[in-house]
Regions:
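Short beta-strand-to-loop transition segments that serve as allosteric relay/switch motifs
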Residues: 69, 135-144
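Signal-transmission linkers at sensory-effector interfaces
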Residues: 1-31, 42, 133, 164-171
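Helix-loop-beta substructure at the N-terminus of cytosolic sensory domains
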Residues: 23-64, 73, 83, 168
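Acidic/proline- and glycine-rich, intrinsically disordered low-complexity segments
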Residues: 71-96
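Signal-transducing coupling segments at domain and membrane junctions
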Residues: 71-72, 99-120, 140
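A short, aliphatic-rich beta-strand micro-motif
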Residues: 119-127
Length: 885
């Protein structure tokens, strides 16, 4: 039966009012849901109205309430998102109306539901607070062409129903509360830095947890439902689930945060934080190295502090490469496709209720990208994905890998990140008050922001650029000129020509924005763009600030380096992410209640001096033992994969002594990091590692860029030591360096070795993670260590002298490294008292924790950005950090 035009509006409006009343006066959510679908069927004059809910795995729909279909199917009728018309609605997150269902290619007949009599179908998504909850469906026996107005009104009805559905999914009988709460924990990366939550997933199935790369969505998806039901019903585990879930809710809903007190101006217009990569957790492989890890830590601390901030990046379908070494120690690269269904991501929904899709015009055609949304605590991370229908094959591959391809691929990736990222924000109704560019890769976002301001306010380029630049923060990480992205004029015109025209700029005018000396034929430099179109620019350590001001002095010819107003905010690390559980419990006992929320305050860390030396040392030895077990296990797995003899595999199970001084090195095998500096004098090294009274051993990990032959040769040098009789038990290289490997290393080493060629390390953060866990740094005074080392909180390689001759520089540093090991590090480690404790070493551990723990953590870093950059850029109180004029 089709409603008449005269009855349609009144009946629909009444339906919306009554749905609101039902939701307001709800008893049990499931009962309310049944009443709602009955009311909709009556008012829309349809024969069927059904509500399908997404199951916790978000891969299937389950029939939750119906009028017209067989009631015994409630809770039992399931369909995957790729099945049927209801699945199509959920998959595309948009309404689907079909007059004759049997003619549609996605039609699927569910006999048990008794739906063979129904011909027409209208389904709309149920969305609550931007999250898809399920699908609302009406069906009729007679063929019916649903009008646009009817689709709109059912969509509005669904908006009223969605909150009821959201509550029902958690509380009602067809989805067990404990299971739903586990899925709720898994779908927000907050679990990754909450030790109680990650421990829950480990305890559900320890073997699967390790095999599935610590991915809770994969674990929950693979564990049989009966096992989850049985385990979650155990009294102790049930209580832990409820406790973790309650803490997550309290965390997400907290309003008394540091950000609420100090960054309220950002709430209506948040910070948009752009980065080419984000290192959040090993199970989300969209990072390659330090830049991504820093970005991930920045988001996590912004979440903890309550800073209104949205991350913007790219979704790399194959991530960075997986590393294996062949029998000769040569690096091999393998790229694996990431299964999106195993990640805690959902399609980003725009203000129009549809999935966000952005499009960027170039001279060669349009590039399109869909947008994923990932929850990082209180913060959203938007990830653009070019692997969509309608793109040319080369464009579908744009976001497949990090840092792959030539300059043409790179400029297209950066166009997608900057311009596409800004458009994605606007499509979601986010108008950022601050743009923070984490390196130059995202610099095109500023040009798009200027275009948008010109259009919104009806002003010209110069006026718009002036206004936008006040809101831009630019962070540079690269201390060498060759490391900055540069693109030729032809590439810029091919890809930015349409944008340039909308900005009202000539080709020369656009190129000048990215040239240090306009008009001399230079390529377009992304860092120059960032420096010119930002009010505030910063380096990432004090020394790096000096290097950057010298490097970019040409931007202010005739002025002193000090006139190049690049300030610095030294990097820090997210304490909960990198702190071992054992050390966290030790701090809980001795630093005072709530120390986590005040970790950027020096007074908190003074409590480390009250820790008993024996307790601290035993905690460290426990972590060291865990590291060595991990390294042995990985070494055996590597040998087995290479089909090495059984005896050789078993021998690896006994390498590395828990009593030996253990030095760790894990990072990119870039040339300037000099991973092989310790090999400068192989005879001295052999004597050192084989000293029967004071032995030293090394654990290494790291990746060389696929195109870096030098880096691969250095890596091979180190790997070959595992087959050298002099070093076989004292050197182990762990393949496939990732966040998991890094976490084990920084939590368990005695000494962290860092020997870059000064001043080429912008900051570095791995040594900061070591400090938190009781390890000591042995480093060239470069990057963060140049301002951190006080003579008693670690060890320095040399005095910071440099030399224009690289060979002289390296030889001098190599000699200083051996001398420091021989005269300072090794004697102090092995000097024991009558209790067997290295009191001098422990004293240095405590001093490192006390003097560095508060200074070099991401909470302090994000607080600095907020007070010195974000708030002033948004129009708040000015800062004392250097402002770029």
């Amino acid at each position: 039966m089709t409603p008449t035009a005269s009855s349609r509006d009144a009946s629909y409006v009444l339906t919306l009012e009554e749905i609101g009343n039902l939701a307001k006066n709800a008893g049990k959510p499931a009962e309310t849901l049944m009443n709602v679908v009955a009311l909709i069927a009556k008012r829309f004059q349809t024969d069927v109205c059904s509500a399908y809910l997404l199951e916790p795995d978000r891969a299937n729909l389950v029939l939750a309430a119906t009028v017209g279909l067989r009631p015994q199917c409630i809770g039992t009728l399931r369909l995957a998102l790729h099945e049927g018309l209801a699945g199509l609605v959920a998959e595309q997150v948009r309404p689907v109306a079909v007059e004759q269902v049997k003619t549609h290619p996605r039609f699927k007949y569910f006999r048990e539901a008794g739906e063979d009599a129904y011909q027409s179908f209208l389904g709309v998504p149920l969305i609550d607070r931007g999250v898809l909850q399920g699908v609302l469906v009406v069906q009729t026996m007679a063929a019916r062409a649903f009008l646009d107005e009817e689709v709109r009104m059912l969509t509005e009805a669904a908006a009223q129903v969605a909150p009821v559905v959201s509550e029902a999914r958690t509380l009602d009988r067809f989805i067990a509360p404990s299971q739903e709460r586990l899925w709720s924990l898994a779908r927000n990366l907050w679990w990754s830095w909450d030790q109680e939550s990650s421990g829950l997933f480990l305890d559900l199935d320890p073997k699967r947890w390790r095999q599935l790369n610590h991915n809770p969505i994969s674990v929950l998806g693979e564990i049989p439902m009966s096992q989850i039901e049985r385990r979650s019903g155990e009294l102790v585990l049930h209580g832990r689930i409820n406790y973790a879930y309650r803490r997550q809710r309290e965390y997400l809903n907290a309003d008394r945060t540091w950000g609420a007190r100090h960054a309220g101006i950002l709430r209506p217009r948040p910070v948009a934080y752009f980065s080419a990569e984000f290192g959040l957790h090993e199970s989300v492989p969209i990072y390659s190295g330090g830049l991504g890890i820093l970005a991930g830590d920045h988001l996590k601390s912004a979440s903890d502090l309550g800073i209104p901030l949205v991350g913007v990046g790219l979704f790399y379908g194959q991530g960075y490469f997986r590393q294996h070494l062949d029998g000769n120690g040569w690096q091999l690269e393998e790229y694996l496709q990431t299964d999106v269904s195993q990640l805690p991501m959902e399609a980003a929904i725009g203000t129009d209720g549809a999935p966000v899709m952005v499009q960027i015009e170039t001279r060669g055609g349009a590039i399109r990208a869909k947008v994923w949304r990932l929850k990082v605590g209180r913060c959203d991370l938007l990830l653009l994905d070019s692997n969509v229908e309608g793109n040319a094959p080369e464009d579908r591959e744009l976001t497949s890998r990090l840092y792959g391809g030539d300059g043409r691929v790179r400029v297209r990736q950066e166009l997608l990140l900057g311009v596409g990222g800004f458009r994605a924000l606007r499509a979601m109704g986010v108008t950022p008050g601050v743009l923070h560019l984490n390196e130059g890769h995202s610099g095109f976002a500023v040009l798009e922001a200027i275009r948008s301001r010109m259009q919104d306010e009806g002003i010209g380029f110069d006026a718009a650029a002036t206004r936008v630049s006040r809101e831009v923060i630019f962070t540079t990480h690269t201390p060498v000129p060759a490391g900055h992205d540069r693109f030729g004029a032809d590439l810029i015109e091919e890809h930015l020509g349409p944008l340039r025209e909308s900005l009202g700029l000539s080709h020369e005018g656009l190129m000048a924005i990215g040239q240090e000396h306009p008009g001399n034929g230079e390529d377009f430099c992304m860092t120059v763009l960032g420096l010119k179109l930002s009010r505030r620019a910063n380096a990432v350590s004090a020394l790096h600030g000096e290097v950057s001001r010298e490097m970019w002095a040409g931007l202010r010819p005739g002025k002193s380096e000090e006139a190049v107003r690049i300030g610095h905010i030294t990097n820090g690390v997210h304490v909960p992410t990198w702190l071992a559980p054992q050390m966290s419990r030790l701090y809980d006992r001795h630093l005072g209640a709530g120390w986590h929320e005040h970790s950027a305050e020096a007074r908190i860390w003074e409590g480390i001096e009250n820790v008993d030396d024996g307790e601290l040392w035993e905690t460290h030895l426990s972590l060291k033992s865990r590291l060595l077990d991990f390294v042995r296990r990985r070494a055996m797995d590597q040998a087995e994969r290479r089909s090495e003899p059984r005896g050789a595999i078993l021998r690896l199970g006994g390498v590395l002594s828990p009593d030996a001084l253990t030095i760790g090195f894990a990072r990119r095998f870039a040339t300037y990091k000099r991973a092989n500096l310790i090999l400068a004098d192989i005879e001295k090294l052999a004597l050192m590692v084989n000293d029967p009274k004071r032995p030293v051993q090394f654990v290494f990990a790291g990746k060389a860029h696929p195109h870096d032959e030098w880096g691969k040769r250095v890596l091979q040098q180190i790997a070959e030591l595992m087959r050298n009789a002099q070093f076989a038990d004292k050197f182990v290289f762990v393949e496939d360096y990732d966040i998991n490997v890094g976490r084990h290393f920084v939590q368990g080493v005695d000494v962290w070795l860092n020997n870059p060629r000064r001043p080429l390390e912008a900051s570095g953060t791995s040594g900061q993670k070591v400090v938190l866990n009781g390890g000591l740094n042995l480093s060239v005074p470069d990057g963060w260590w140049a301002e951190a080392y006080d003579g008693l909180n670690g060890f320095a390689i040399g005095t910071g002298r440099t030399h224009s001759n690289m060979n002289v520089h390296d030889t001098r540093d190599g000699d200083d490294l051996y001398r420091t090991l021989r005269e300072e590090v090794i004697p102090l480690y092995y000097e024991r008292d009558h209790d067997g404790l290295p009191r001098g070493w422990i004293k240095r551990m405590k001093r490192a924790i006390r003097t560095l723990g508060w200074r070099f953590n991401a909470d302090r870093m994000v607080m600095d950005y907020t007070l010195k950059c974000y708030v002033p850029a948004a129009g708040g109180t000015s800062s004392d950090m250097r402002m770029k004029l």
